Design a protein with these regions (language model features):
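Conserved mixed alpha/beta core segments that line enzyme active sites in large multi-domain catalysts
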Residues: 1-246
Length: 246
């Protein structure tokens, strides 16, 4: 009683190494009360048989009746008072597997997942992370124009509000938090033995970071085209550049 939860679907065939069922099944945020939880569970199960879901099964040579579904009920992290986002243990654009990519924006993570907002982005060097060196090699301040929060005037609902210009100019995630998330992502990748697509949330009350979902990355993970080359600059050239002020 009095605990807000997320009711999330998870199918046995979802997120296999060959196909990702991301977004095919229903999930619900900020749900409270036994009757509402049961109703949202029913809708999650029923979402296996939508036209979209059945079509996706057939496109990937899977029979819909060969699938089963689990529905996870998990306590909501109060990311509406902080931030949330996504994390890929592979570059989502190039497929380069030597980096971790983090996207972060204010509020619940749905707007980041759906691509509605432009999040802050961070690129983390995996090898540097493993060696205990400062691993953030690049970060970009996103627009973060909107955020999804609890609707205090309506039970069991969320809504979208505008973010102030001052808040948009700030980083939604600190460097230390970014490194902590990347360490979690690396552990998850090592455990599953493959690049992962992860969703995370920061609780604005406890300031804790939570992993709320992890699935195999299915777009670039099977490609071996991307490579990273390391070059060591000659010490004489380094000294000359410093002397010249470059």
């Amino acid at each position: 009683p009095g605990v807000d939860v997320a009711v999330r679907s998870s199918a046995t065939t979802e997120d296999s190494a060959e196909a990702s069922f991301a977004g095919q099944y229903e999930s619900y945020l900020n749900v409270s009360g036994e009757s509402e939880i049961v109703e949202k569970w029913r809708r999650c199960v029923a979402s296996m048989f939508t036209e979209r879901s059945v079509g996706y099964h057939l496109e990937n040579d899977m029979h819909p009746l060969d699938s089963s579904i689990a529905v996870v009920v998990m306590k909501m992290a109060r990311s509406d008072k902080a931030c949330s986002g996504v994390m890929f243990t592979i570059d989502p654009d190039s497929g380069h597997d030597g980096v971790i990519h983090i996207g972060s924006s204010y509020g619940l993570g749905e707007l980041v997942v759906q691509g509605v907002v432009s999040p802050d982005t961070y690129t983390i060097w995996k090898e540097g992370l493993r060696m205990g060196k400062f691993p953030i090699v690049y970060r970009t301040l996103g627009g973060k124009e909107q955020m999804m929060v609890y609707n205090e005037e309506s039970t069991n609902e969320v809504h979208t509000i505008q973010v102030s210009i001052d808040e948009r100019k700030k980083w939604s995630l600190s460097k230390d938090e970014c490194v902590s998330l990347a360490e979690m992502g690396l552990k998850i990748e090592d455990y599953f033995g493959m690049p992962m697509d992860i969703e995370w949330a920061k609780d604005g009350i406890s300031n804790e970071l939570f992993i709320v979902q992890a699935r195999p990355e299915t777009i670039h993970s099977k490609s071996s085209e991307s490579k990273m080359m390391l070059y060591k600059i000659d010490e004489k050239l380094t000294s000359k550049l410093k002397k010249d002020g470059r």
